[in-house]
């Protein structure tokens, strides 16, 4: 992009004709429309839902004692080996009850395409897309394979018994070494030449709306053994089964699903994929390749959207950006608490004059004029604390400034530079790596490691000990990838300019830019 390219006060003059994948694959909301749909869900629903739910619950609880009998009396040593050939009559009973339970929910027919490979050929099954809590029905089609689950789930009635029944691999969030043990156990079972039952993974790690494939996590691929991709499709006229991070709740999805006469489900087994030597050595590359194969078969985009903690994120170059910036949430709760944006400039001036730097909870409440303890605590906890439990008030001022829809993207970038730049020995104002990280952390929530990669990329083109104001503004306004952050992503919702960052399939930046090979800025 040259200096002559039109850049308006609030963003580019045009959207460059770029298309992005759906903005939020973690969002799905469905409401019945029309007379027939409303009749189905609100007239048939009160009849079908209670009956189906009750019958499904009965068959679920019938599995409890049978699953417990499978492992009753077995020692830890015996359970460390496969018990797939022991007490097989109980396995068949659980299989029958499982299929009946899903039948009661409305899954009367399951269309199966392809052939499931035996454990000796494909010790691991990877299933996608993961779009609903009904997806475990695939375990019935796959003859009740083992799964990876949290150890806390052992304490859930019925579920815990079923996890013990199929010798699931358990991971503990409290044990730092647990993930390493899980990896070793997956490798041990996967290389047992079919002695153990197959291990089934949902490699996306969470539910999406099914319109794209989320980023595959490498856990299913660390063993470096062949895997069999398994596709799930719900070819129904109404997307009632989908349950995502944000949207229809559990009860509503159950009601909408069980109010239909029946639910269509297709499960397709793709050919077993044998990794190359390079892919065996790199689980991330292996996961990427399998994701691409499954995406092509589904005719859906393969993306790097993922859920980190409780935050849905999308990739933009070296950064992982929250789909819904938390700074708008902070602005909303402060507004409800009576805080006015009219006072922001005064707070900014104090920071520029060096009057205030680090503040505690009480001092933050005093400066913002907010007395509600719960509100000020949420705001305070958003920012990084130092060893003394203090936060940088410059970060607070920058976040508050971003709430102002009248402030242009360029003005916000210049303010960020002024707040966090320092003078070098020659008196030049420069933005250091730490200052750059503080800007991205406060506005985007980006970890320092990610910010450091971006800074290193930009710093390559200068001999100074940091970025000049012009260099930082070019990054914010004209960089072929990251400009979308300041021009669109960080525009307040009230400005009407809020858009997702332009994201390509499988991550990267918009246009022709690859996150690993960014072109030099103009």
Curated annotation (Swiss-Prot):
Q: Which organism is it from?
A: Xenopus laevis
InterPro entries for the chain? EF-hand-dom_pair, LPCAT1-like, Plipid/glycerol_acylTrfase
Q: Where is this motif: HXXXXD motif?
A: 130-135
Upper lineage is:
Eukaryota, Metazoa, Chordata, Craniata, Vertebrata
**SUPFAM superfamilies xref list:** EF-hand, Glycerol-3-phosphate (1)-acyltransferase
Where do transmembrane segments lie in this chain? Answer: 43-63, 92-112
Q: Where on the tree of life does the source sit, at the highest rank?
A: Eukaryota
EC number(s) of the enzyme?
A: 2.3.1.23, 2.3.1.n6, 2.3.1.121, 2.3.1.67
Sequence segments annotated as region (Disordered): 496-522
Q: Which GO terms describe its biological process?
A: phosphatidylcholine acyl-chain remodeling; phospholipid biosynthetic process
Full protein name: Lysophospholipid acyltransferase LPCAT4
């Amino acid at each position: 992009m040259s200096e002559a390219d039109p850049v308006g006060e609030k963003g580019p003059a045009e959207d460059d004709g770029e298309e992005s994948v759906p903005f939020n694959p973690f969002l799905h909301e469905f409401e019945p429309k029309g007379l027939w749909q409303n009749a189905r869900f609100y007239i048939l629903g009160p009849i079908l839902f209670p009956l189906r739910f009750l019958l499904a619950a009965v068959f679920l609880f019938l599995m409890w004692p049978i699953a417990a009998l499978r492992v009753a009396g077995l020692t830890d040593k015996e359970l460390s080996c496969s018990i797939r050939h022991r007490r097989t009559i109980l396995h068949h009973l659980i299989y029958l009850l499982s299929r009946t339970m899903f039948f009661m929910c409305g899954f009367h027919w399951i269309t199966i395409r392809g052939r499931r490979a035996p454990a000796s050929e494909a010790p691991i099954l990877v299933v996608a897309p993961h779009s609903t809590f009904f997806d475990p029905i695939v375990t019935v089609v796959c003859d009740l394979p083992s799964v990876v689950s949290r150890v806390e789930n052992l304490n859930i009635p019925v579920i815990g018994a079923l996890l013990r029944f199929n010798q699931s691999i358990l991971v503990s969030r409290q044990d730092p070494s647990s993930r390493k043990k899980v990896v070793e156990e997956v490798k041990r079972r996967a290389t047992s030449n079919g002695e153990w039952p197959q291990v089934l993974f949902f490699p996306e790690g969470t539910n999406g709306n099914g319109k794209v494939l989320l980023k595959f996590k490498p856990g299913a691929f660390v063993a470096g053994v062949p895997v069999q991709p398994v596709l799930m499709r719900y070819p129904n006229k109404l997307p009632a089964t989908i349950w995502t991070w944000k949207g229809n709740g559990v009860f509503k999805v159950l009601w909408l699903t069980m109010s239909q006469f029946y639910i269509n489900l297709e499960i397709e087994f793709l050919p077993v994929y044998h990794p190359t030597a390079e892919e065996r050595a790199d689980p991330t590359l292996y996961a990427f390749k399998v994701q691409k194969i499954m995406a092509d078969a589904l005719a859906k985009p393969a993306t790097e959207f993922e859920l980190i903690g409780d935050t849905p994120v999308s990739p933009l170059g070296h950064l992982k950006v929250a789909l819904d910036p938390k700074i708008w949430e902070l602005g909303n709760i402060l507004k409800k608490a009576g805080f006015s944006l009219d006072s922001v400039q005064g707070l900014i001036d104090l920071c520029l004059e060096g009057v205030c730097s680090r503040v505690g909870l009480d001092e933050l409440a005093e400066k913002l004029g907010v007395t509600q303890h719960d509100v000020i605590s949420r705001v305070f906890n958003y920012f990084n604390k130092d060893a003394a439990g203090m936060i940088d008030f410059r970060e607070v001022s920058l976040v508050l400034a971003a709430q102002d829809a009248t402030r242009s993207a360029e003005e916000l970038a210049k303010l960020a530079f002024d707040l966090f730049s320092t003078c070098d020995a020659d008196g030049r104002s420069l933005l250091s790596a730490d200052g750059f990280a503080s800007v991205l952390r406060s506005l985007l929530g980006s970890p320092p490691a990610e910010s450091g990669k971006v800074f290193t990329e930009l710093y390559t083109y200068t001999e100074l000990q940091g970025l000049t104001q012009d260099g930082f503004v070019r990054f914010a306004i004209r960089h072929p990838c990251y400009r979308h952050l300041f021009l669109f992503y960080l525009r307040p919702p009230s400005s009407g300019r809020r858009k997702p960052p332009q994201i390509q399939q499988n991550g990267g930046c918009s246009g022709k830019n690859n996150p690993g090979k960014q072109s030099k800025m103009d």
